[in-house]
């Protein structure tokens, strides 16, 4: 199953260039339900609300502290780690 996430252009470009290998979501009940109610194998990133997308294989989804330079806040977040583009 594929998880679809909308990204701002800046973060989309970083992933596209291979500079970012994690995406972050708030540690809130909404994201807990959304991320763990299905067994996701892939993540599809959308550049803002356009039709431009790219899909990657998910390595893991966990809770922790992300990298500030990749847009993570200073508190615990859901970390979606991904590997190669499909």
PLM features: what roles do these ranges have?
Residues 1-86:
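Catalytic phosphate/metal-binding cores of nucleic-acid and nucleotide-processing enzymes, i.e., regions
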